[in-house]
Amino acid sequence: MVNYPSGVRAGGYPQKKKNQNIRYGKRGMGLEEMINQANDYYLVNHQAVIHKKPTPITVVHVDYPDRSMAKITEAYYVQPSTTDYNGVVSGKYIDFDAKETKNKTNMPLKNFHQHQITHLKNVLENGGIGFLVLGFTTLSEYYIFPASLLIKIWDKAKAGGEKSLPYKIVSKQGIKINSKMIPSLDYLPALKKLFNI
Protein backbone atom coordinates (compact mmCIF):
# COMPACT_ATOMS: atom_id res chain seq x y z
CA MET A 1 0.00 0.00 0.00
CA VAL A 2 1.41 3.38 -1.00
CA ASN A 3 0.50 6.51 0.94
CA TYR A 4 1.04 10.08 -0.15
CA PRO A 5 2.69 12.49 2.30
CA SER A 6 -0.67 14.12 3.09
CA GLY A 7 -1.86 10.78 4.53
CA VAL A 8 -4.12 9.98 1.57
CA ARG A 9 -3.88 6.42 0.35
CA ALA A 10 -3.19 5.67 -3.29
CA GLY A 11 -6.78 4.44 -3.60
CA GLY A 12 -8.10 7.87 -2.61
CA TYR A 13 -9.20 6.97 0.92
CA PRO A 14 -7.79 9.02 3.81
CA GLN A 15 -5.63 7.20 6.31
CA LYS A 16 -7.39 6.33 9.57
CA LYS A 17 -6.44 8.53 12.51
CA LYS A 18 -4.66 6.62 15.22
CA ASN A 19 -5.61 6.86 18.87
CA GLN A 20 -3.59 9.67 20.43
CA ASN A 21 -3.84 8.21 23.95
CA ILE A 22 -1.13 5.63 23.38
CA ARG A 23 0.71 4.08 26.33
CA TYR A 24 4.25 3.21 25.36
CA GLY A 25 5.21 1.18 28.43
CA LYS A 26 5.63 -2.56 27.84
CA ARG A 27 4.50 -2.07 24.23
CA GLY A 28 4.07 -5.30 22.29
CA MET A 29 5.00 -7.51 25.20
CA GLY A 30 2.45 -9.87 26.73
CA LEU A 31 2.38 -10.71 30.42
CA GLU A 32 3.95 -14.15 30.02
CA GLU A 33 6.70 -12.74 27.83
CA MET A 34 7.50 -10.13 30.50
CA ILE A 35 7.55 -12.83 33.20
CA ASN A 36 9.81 -15.05 31.07
CA GLN A 37 12.20 -12.12 30.57
CA ALA A 38 12.22 -11.45 34.32
CA ASN A 39 12.81 -15.15 35.08
CA ASP A 40 15.81 -15.21 32.72
CA TYR A 41 17.17 -12.11 34.46
CA TYR A 42 16.69 -13.64 37.93
CA LEU A 43 18.41 -16.88 36.87
CA VAL A 44 21.44 -15.13 35.32
CA ASN A 45 21.78 -12.89 38.39
CA HIS A 46 21.39 -15.81 40.86
CA GLN A 47 18.25 -14.32 42.45
CA ALA A 48 15.79 -17.16 41.75
CA VAL A 49 15.17 -20.26 39.65
CA ILE A 50 11.71 -19.99 38.08
CA HIS A 51 10.51 -21.74 34.93
CA LYS A 52 7.39 -21.85 32.81
CA LYS A 53 5.75 -25.25 32.97
CA PRO A 54 5.22 -26.97 29.62
CA THR A 55 1.65 -27.76 28.62
CA PRO A 56 1.29 -31.55 28.32
CA ILE A 57 0.01 -32.46 24.83
CA THR A 58 -0.15 -35.54 22.64
CA VAL A 59 0.75 -34.90 19.02
CA VAL A 60 -1.56 -36.70 16.59
CA HIS A 61 -0.55 -35.36 13.18
CA VAL A 62 2.45 -33.49 11.81
CA ASP A 63 2.84 -32.03 8.31
CA TYR A 64 6.30 -31.96 6.79
CA PRO A 65 6.22 -29.45 3.91
CA ASP A 66 10.03 -29.40 4.15
CA ARG A 67 12.49 -31.50 6.12
CA SER A 68 13.30 -28.55 8.36
CA MET A 69 9.75 -27.20 8.65
CA ALA A 70 7.65 -29.66 10.64
CA LYS A 71 4.22 -28.28 11.56
CA ILE A 72 1.94 -29.82 14.18
CA THR A 73 -1.57 -29.79 12.70
CA GLU A 74 -3.41 -31.84 15.31
CA ALA A 75 -2.74 -32.30 19.01
CA TYR A 76 -4.69 -32.89 22.21
CA TYR A 77 -4.14 -31.95 25.82
CA VAL A 78 -3.11 -35.00 27.83
CA GLN A 79 -4.47 -33.51 31.05
CA PRO A 80 -5.44 -30.05 32.27
CA SER A 81 -2.34 -28.03 33.08
CA THR A 82 -1.99 -26.67 36.58
CA THR A 83 -0.39 -23.23 36.87
CA ASP A 84 1.99 -21.41 34.54
CA TYR A 85 5.19 -21.21 36.62
CA ASN A 86 7.06 -22.77 39.52
CA GLY A 87 10.47 -22.50 41.09
CA VAL A 88 12.55 -21.55 44.11
CA VAL A 89 13.11 -18.12 45.67
CA SER A 90 15.28 -17.76 48.79
CA GLY A 91 14.90 -21.47 49.53
CA LYS A 92 11.10 -21.37 49.26
CA TYR A 93 9.03 -23.28 46.70
CA ILE A 94 6.79 -20.96 44.66
CA ASP A 95 4.00 -21.77 42.25
CA PHE A 96 1.94 -19.21 40.37
CA ASP A 97 -0.31 -18.39 37.49
CA ALA A 98 -0.34 -15.28 35.30
CA LYS A 99 -3.59 -13.70 34.15
CA GLU A 100 -4.35 -10.41 32.46
CA THR A 101 -7.49 -8.51 31.51
CA LYS A 102 -8.46 -5.34 29.70
CA ASN A 103 -11.21 -4.83 32.27
CA LYS A 104 -10.52 -1.85 34.57
CA THR A 105 -12.72 -2.91 37.48
CA ASN A 106 -12.20 -6.65 37.95
CA MET A 107 -10.54 -9.87 36.89
CA PRO A 108 -13.29 -12.29 35.78
CA LEU A 109 -13.12 -15.62 37.60
CA LYS A 110 -13.87 -17.36 34.29
CA ASN A 111 -10.15 -16.77 33.58
CA PHE A 112 -9.41 -19.42 36.23
CA HIS A 113 -10.25 -23.12 36.27
CA GLN A 114 -11.11 -25.51 39.09
CA HIS A 115 -8.00 -27.65 38.51
CA GLN A 116 -5.81 -24.54 38.94
CA ILE A 117 -7.55 -23.62 42.20
CA THR A 118 -7.17 -27.21 43.45
CA HIS A 119 -3.48 -27.18 42.53
CA LEU A 120 -2.88 -23.88 44.36
CA LYS A 121 -4.70 -25.27 47.44
CA ASN A 122 -2.38 -28.30 47.36
CA VAL A 123 0.69 -26.05 47.10
CA LEU A 124 -0.43 -24.03 50.14
CA GLU A 125 -1.33 -27.15 52.16
CA ASN A 126 2.19 -28.48 51.58
CA GLY A 127 3.97 -25.32 52.72
CA GLY A 128 4.63 -23.76 49.32
CA ILE A 129 3.95 -20.18 48.30
CA GLY A 130 1.09 -19.86 45.84
CA PHE A 131 0.20 -16.60 44.17
CA LEU A 132 -0.93 -14.87 41.00
CA VAL A 133 0.60 -12.24 38.79
CA LEU A 134 -2.42 -10.21 37.70
CA GLY A 135 -2.30 -7.67 34.91
CA PHE A 136 -4.84 -4.92 34.31
CA THR A 137 -3.52 -4.00 30.87
CA THR A 138 -5.79 -1.00 30.24
CA LEU A 139 -4.47 0.53 33.47
CA SER A 140 -0.88 -0.67 32.84
CA GLU A 141 -0.88 -2.11 36.36
CA TYR A 142 0.41 -5.47 37.55
CA TYR A 143 0.08 -7.06 40.99
CA ILE A 144 1.25 -10.02 43.04
CA PHE A 145 -1.87 -11.46 44.67
CA PRO A 146 -1.93 -14.32 47.22
CA ALA A 147 -3.55 -17.57 46.13
CA SER A 148 -5.16 -17.92 49.57
CA LEU A 149 -7.37 -14.89 48.88
CA LEU A 150 -8.21 -16.07 45.36
CA ILE A 151 -9.31 -19.41 46.82
CA LYS A 152 -11.63 -17.67 49.32
CA ILE A 153 -13.16 -15.52 46.57
CA TRP A 154 -13.50 -18.59 44.31
CA ASP A 155 -15.30 -20.54 47.05
CA LYS A 156 -17.69 -17.61 47.66
CA ALA A 157 -18.42 -17.41 43.91
CA LYS A 158 -19.21 -21.14 43.84
CA ALA A 159 -21.69 -20.51 46.67
CA GLY A 160 -23.45 -17.82 44.61
CA GLY A 161 -21.23 -14.81 45.30
CA GLU A 162 -19.55 -12.37 42.94
CA LYS A 163 -18.03 -14.02 39.84
CA SER A 164 -15.01 -11.75 39.64
CA LEU A 165 -11.96 -10.62 41.57
CA PRO A 166 -12.54 -6.87 42.08
CA TYR A 167 -9.71 -4.48 41.21
CA LYS A 168 -10.21 -2.75 44.59
CA ILE A 169 -9.40 -5.98 46.42
CA VAL A 170 -6.42 -6.73 44.17
CA SER A 171 -4.96 -3.23 44.66
CA LYS A 172 -5.49 -3.33 48.47
CA GLN A 173 -4.56 -6.94 49.24
CA GLY A 174 -1.94 -7.44 46.55
CA ILE A 175 1.40 -5.74 46.03
CA LYS A 176 1.85 -3.56 42.96
CA ILE A 177 4.75 -4.54 40.73
CA ASN A 178 6.95 -1.59 39.84
CA SER A 179 8.16 -1.21 36.26
CA LYS A 180 11.85 -1.11 35.43
CA MET A 181 13.95 -1.16 32.32
CA ILE A 182 15.44 -4.60 32.93
CA PRO A 183 13.45 -6.66 33.65
CA SER A 184 10.39 -4.72 32.56
CA LEU A 185 8.17 -6.58 35.05
CA ASP A 186 10.39 -6.95 38.13
CA TYR A 187 7.98 -8.97 40.25
CA LEU A 188 10.49 -10.47 42.70
CA PRO A 189 10.60 -7.47 45.12
CA ALA A 190 6.78 -7.44 45.33
CA LEU A 191 6.75 -11.21 45.90
CA LYS A 192 9.34 -10.95 48.69
CA LYS A 193 7.42 -8.10 50.31
CA LEU A 194 4.05 -9.88 50.23
CA PHE A 195 5.38 -13.15 51.66
CA ASN A 196 8.24 -11.78 53.83
CA ILE A 197 10.94 -13.83 52.11
Swiss-Prot record:
Keywords for this protein: Cytoplasm, DNA damage, DNA recombination, DNA repair, Endonuclease, Hydrolase, Magnesium, Metal-binding, Nuclease
Site positions (Transition state stabilizer): 99
Leader sequence segment: none
Recorded GO MF terms: endonuclease activity; magnesium ion binding; nucleic acid binding
Residue segments, region Disordered: 1-21
Entries under InterPro entries matching the protein: Resolv_RecU (IPR004612), Restrct_endonuc-II-like (IPR011335), tRNA_endonuc-like_dom_sf (IPR011856)
GO cellular-component term (any): cytoplasm
Cofactor binding description: Binds 1 Mg(2+) ion per subunit.
Cofactor: Mg(2+)
Residues the entry annotates as binding Mg(2+): 82, 84, 97, 116
Subcellular location: Cytoplasm
Example GO BP: DNA recombination
Family: Belongs to the RecU family.
Primary role: Endonuclease that resolves Holliday junction intermediates in genetic recombination. Cleaves mobile four-strand junctions by introducing symmetrical nicks in paired strands. Promotes annealing of linear ssDNA with homologous dsDNA. Required for DNA repair, homologous recombination and chromosome segregation.
Descriptive protein name: Holliday junction resolvase RecU
Organism of this sequence: Oenococcus oeni (strain ATCC BAA-331 / PSU-1)
Gene name of the record: recU
